[in-house]
């Protein structure tokens, strides 16, 4: 599995959120007939909800999984138990496996994955509340970005 970093930083050095660009992104995907699927943990289905609120999305959106527990990640997305044990659910490695395995399972051209500590509790010194990994898999290339938010639960999830 090739791994690359994908920059989510705008020219104004602010993070770009899907909320502000989803209609243009969806239109591009529709115009180019690019199929997509999602695998979410900390976002709890909010990414899928945002995507499916867009007109015409049914033409390209194939599937969405909410795998909040480790067991769900193993069962539904075939995340390796040893990877979960070694790195934990909130890790670049798990995010990568979620995304890559989803692409193999759904045959979608682009897959997205999220895992993180949304809060308000549950964080540790090494993995604090607000630590999120976002993955994108395209043509078997995996891009995972680590994000660190300092905000409320609803902001972290979206």
Task: Pin down the residues of each PLM region.
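Short alpha-helical segments enriched in small residues
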Residues: 8-158
């Amino acid at each position: 599995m090739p791994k690359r970093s994908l920059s989510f930083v705008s020219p104004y050095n602010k993070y770009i959120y899907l909320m502000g660009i989803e209609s243009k992104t969806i239109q591009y995907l529709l115009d180019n007939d690019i199929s997509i699927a999602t695998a979410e943990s900390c976002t709890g289905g909010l990414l899928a909800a945002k995507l499916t609120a867009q007109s015409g999305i049914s033409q390209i959106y194939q599937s969405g999984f909410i795998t909040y527990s480790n067991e769900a990640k193993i069962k539904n997305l075939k995340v390796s138990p040893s990877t979960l044990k070694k790195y934990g659910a909130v890790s670049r490695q798990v995010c990568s496996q979620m995304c890559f395995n989803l692409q193999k399972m759904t045959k979608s051209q682009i897959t997205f994955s999220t895992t993180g500590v949304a809060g308000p509790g549950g964080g540790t010194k090494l993995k604090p509340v607000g630590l999120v990994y976002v993955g994108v898999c395209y043509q078997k290339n995996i891009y995972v970005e680590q994000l660190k938010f300092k905000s409320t639960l609803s902001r972290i999830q979206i």
